[in-house]
């Protein structure tokens, strides 16, 4: 076979023209310092703020400080295997977490990895932990109620879907109990719940998960946990991971309740990280952008417009106070960001008034527009009556003689306090709340001894369930009260049959 030099040269020329170099170009740097959950690296010239970086041992970090000579990195996970001189690579991506239906019923860490021992989570969807909040024109007004099942909240400080309502109080005043009871009350309410535990003891988180499982609430709940034993970067990231998971459902038109327990510990973790990264400290040694830390998180909770699906994220952030000081730095920051706050007093808690809600210091700025008509009618004057009772109660300590009208107000106030008490993990449907509050505000309980109020309420609800379910059904379906004569007749019938007359 004759070799044609012309053909060979044409073939070589064609191969050269069609050659496409396939280089894997990755910008790398060198770790110059490692310790306390942070690292410094030199050589990453074009790294972005918040970019995910890959260490030689397979661990990941997130670029936090971009300086002229090096980059400050927070390490996501264990840093014991990382050494000075190790190579670090850019990934070109920002931090993302897995999202979707497959996370429901699972307990995960802030990176979306399962920690409940139930195997891998199979999902191919991810969302960035840092995402812009919905814009002004992408939002709708809060108009649908979120029923907590707690009389004191649904009557005095109602919460709407898409609202941010701060729960603030000292440690051991029942903050977590309110959140767990609210999650339990979302059963059959077409609501997905996300409980973010930040800096909690692992035994405490285990207890909360078992409570949710016992009452069947884990069927619609995701638990994101960054326990006290984990590195600070995970505590800092946990709330952002939780809200990223929530956004996936919100933009599908679903309603989500997210609980941050608690943001005080996130702020402390953030302060620790940025002091280690040598950011200049401000008030109480917190970095200057600690307000932005929480505002960019809580602004992602909203009720979005119908064009975006009409879904919502309702946020219940917690802040722990010291000796009831709600004027502390982080507390005032979060109060100014949220749409209201529920203040829990340790004095009330120790006096046996649980939930220990201080009606005078608690407010819901937008929840009133979401409250159902029936509750508005029966609870309209309840807050004023309660405040008036507290004021009069203070005067009675002087031992002065009281006129009949003042005595009647005190009697009604004592019964109001008793009615608003509620046992743990027993949320009450809104129609039952309305009937007992109607009986209270219309004077049907004025002759019932204060010590018998709890027994009265139990028998009252049992009577309505058995004898007048149609009244409860009317309230549930129409969101309004039936005719007063019908309710009055039913309550009078109960009193005639009971031992309370």
From Swiss-Prot:
Membrane topology: Peripheral membrane protein
Entry annotated with the keyword Ion transport: yes
Catalytic activities: ATP + H2O + 4 H(+)(in) = ADP + phosphate + 5 H(+)(out)
Nucleotide-binding keyword on record: yes
Site location (Required for activity): 362
Compartments where found: Cell membrane
Binding site for ATP: 169-176
Cited InterPro entries: ATP_synth_asu-like_sf, ATP_synth_asu_C, ATP_synth_asu_C_sf, ATP_synth_F1_a_nt-bd_dom, ATP_synth_F1_asu, ATPase_F1/V1/A1_a/bsu_N, ATPase_F1/V1/A1_a/bsu_N_sf, ATPase_F1/V1/A1_a/bsu_nucl-bd
GO CC aspect terms: plasma membrane; proton-transporting ATP synthase complex
One MF annotation (Gene Ontology) recorded for this entry: ADP binding
Function: Produces ATP from ADP in the presence of a proton gradient across the membrane. The alpha chain is a regulatory subunit.
Family in the record: Belongs to the ATPase alpha/beta chains family.
Protein name: ATP synthase subunit alpha
């Amino acid at each position: 076979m004759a070799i044609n030099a012309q053909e060979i040269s044409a073939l070589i020329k064609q191969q050269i023209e069609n050659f496409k170099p396939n280089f894997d170009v990755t910008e790398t740097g060198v770790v110059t310092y490692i310790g306390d959950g942070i690292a410094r690296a030199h050589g990453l010239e074009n790294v972005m703020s918040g970019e995910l970086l890959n260490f030689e041992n397979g661990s990941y970090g997130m670029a936090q400080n971009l300086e002229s000579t090096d980059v400050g990195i927070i390490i996501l996970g264990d840093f014991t295997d990382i050494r000075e001189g190790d190579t670090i690579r850019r990934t070109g991506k920002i931090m993302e977490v897995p999202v979707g239906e497959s996370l429901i019923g699972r307990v995960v860490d802030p990176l979306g990895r399962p920690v409940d021992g139930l195997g891998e989570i199979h999902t191919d969807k991810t969302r960035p932990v840092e995402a812009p909040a919905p814009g002004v024109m992408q939002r709708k007004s809060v108009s649908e109620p979120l029923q907590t099942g707690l009389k004191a909240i649904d009557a005095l400080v109602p919460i709407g879907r898409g609202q941010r309502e701060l729960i603030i109080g000292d440690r051991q005043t029942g903050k977590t109990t309110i959140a767990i009871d609210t999650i339990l009350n979302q059963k059959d309410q077409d609501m997905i719940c996300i409980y973010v535990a930040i800096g909690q003891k692992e035994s405490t988180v285990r207890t909360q998960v078992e409570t949710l499982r016992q009452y069947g609430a884990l069927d619609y709940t995701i638990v994101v946990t960054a326990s006290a034993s984990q590195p600070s970067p995970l505590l800092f990231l946990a709330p952002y991971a939780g809200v990223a998971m929530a956004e996936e459902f919100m933009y599908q038109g679903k309603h989500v309740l997210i609980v941050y327990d608690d943001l005080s510990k996130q702020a402390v973790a953030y302060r620790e990280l940025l002091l280690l990264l040598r950011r200049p400290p401000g008030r109480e040694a917190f970095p200057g952008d600690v307000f932005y830390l929480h505002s960019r998180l809580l602004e992602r909770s909203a009720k979005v417009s119908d064009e975006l699906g009409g879904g919502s994220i309702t946020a219940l952030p917690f802040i722990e106070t010291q000796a009831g000081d709600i004027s502390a730095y982080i507390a005032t920051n979060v109060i100014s960001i949220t749409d209201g706050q529920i203040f829990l007093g340790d004095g009330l808690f120790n006096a046996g008034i649980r939930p220990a809600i201080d009606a005078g210091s608690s407010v819901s700025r937008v929840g009133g527009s979401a409250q159902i008509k029936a509750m508005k009618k029966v609870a309209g004057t309840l807050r004023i009556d309660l405040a008036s009772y507290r004021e009069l109660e203070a005067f009675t300590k002087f031992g002065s003689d009281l006129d009949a009208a003042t005595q009647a107000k005190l009697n009604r106030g004592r019964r109001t306090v008793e009615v608003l008490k509620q046992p743990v993990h027993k949320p009450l449907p809104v129609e039952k709340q309305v009937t007992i509050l109607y009986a209270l505000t219309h004077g049907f309980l004025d002759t019932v001894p204060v010590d018998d109020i709890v027994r009265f309420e139990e028998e009252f609800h049992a009577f309505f369930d058995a004898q007048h379910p149609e009244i409860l059904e009317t309230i549930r379906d129409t969101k309004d009260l039936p005719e007063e004569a019908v309710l009055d007749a039913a309550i009078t019938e109960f009193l005639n049959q009971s031992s309370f007359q």
